[in-house]
Regions:
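RNA-contacting regions in translation and RNA-metabolism proteins
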Residues: 1-45, 55-77
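Glycine-centered tight-turn and secondary-structure capping sites
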Residues: 47-51
Length: 77
């Protein structure tokens, strides 16, 4: 899952070396939180107009997680 998020983000940003993902321990309800960190200059590319790109990233991650019977949440920092 972490590799999928990194691949999605690196496809959008200019500074590919700045893409970092940290993972929190699963919460009580089993939700795994992924924190996506990108360079400040690339933040707009990852979020997109009205958050459309961010929403698409979250949708792809949720779909992939549901195939594994997992719950995920993506936060963009």
């Amino acid at each position: 899952m972490e590799e999928l998020l990194i691949a999605l983000a690196k496809g959008l940003v200019e500074d590919k070396d700045s893409v970092k993902v940290t993972v929190d321990e699963p919460a009580e309800d089993g939700t795994i939180v992924y924190h996506l960190n990108v360079a400040p200059g690339d933040m707009g590319r990852v979020i997109g107009k009205q958050g459309r790109i961010a929403k698409a990233i979250r949708t792809v991650m949720r779909a992939s997680a549901s195939m594994r019977s997992e719950k995920v949440m993506v936060e963009i920092d």
